[in-house]
Amino acid sequence: MAASTVLSTDDVAPRDRAPAWREWIFSHFGGLESDLYGDTDFDGHMAASHAGDVILTKLEANRHRVLRSPHLARASDTPYLKIVAPWQGSATVEQQGRQACARDGGWVIYDTTGSYAIANPERVEHLIVMLPKDQMAERGVRLGDLMARHVGGASGISRVALETMRTTYQELPNMSADAARGAGELIMQLVRLSLLELAGQETAMTQRAALKDRIRDHVARHLRDPDLSVEGI
């Protein structure tokens, strides 16, 4: 059976819940600041288990935001790629000037070695998956270009990855250590495949955008040319 960590504000005095939650978030996720949108009432629960080197955490909480500053990112000991996959509510991830939002049936990936912010503007139930970054490198794929992206989850390999992450978390209490390790390795492989697919989609979109730019530039330069035609473009 995989070892687990359970944290809950149920046994904490109401006035102490917010600071306790901030401390748990900071400790469990390796340096993460949080705030509660100014709310004074709060309740939250976290349950985390390991599938080999993969950490899976179910988080239930009132609305809150988290922030990883550049200083905290630099001070981190272990680099992870991190996934948020909501069961309830939404999560909006900001990193590297990009923003991506996920709800039930979707997931977003980001990098703990860089600064980021996540908004959870309503009560949420999230599955948060942490994958060792040094095991996720894929030849020919620039991971940085894929961070803060909505990877998917509705169909294809990204849906297989999502369902595997969810099922693994739910079944970890019934797994041996070896089985849990194998499940973690499977999750990493499915996420790699999802990122490869996303990289291909991003490349195709970039190529289409570049073609449109070239067409607009050609038309602008030859707008007064009587020989300008669709065939010429």
Regions found by a protein language model. Name each.
Residues 50, 58-60, 130:
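Short, well-ordered beta-strand micro-motif
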Residues 1-45, 54, 90-232:
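Alpha-helical bundle regulatory/interaction domains
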Residues 59, 86, 132-134:
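Generic beta-structure capping elements
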Residues 52-54, 61-66, 71-93, 106:
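Glycine- and acidic-residue-biased ligand/ion/polar-headgroup-sensing regions
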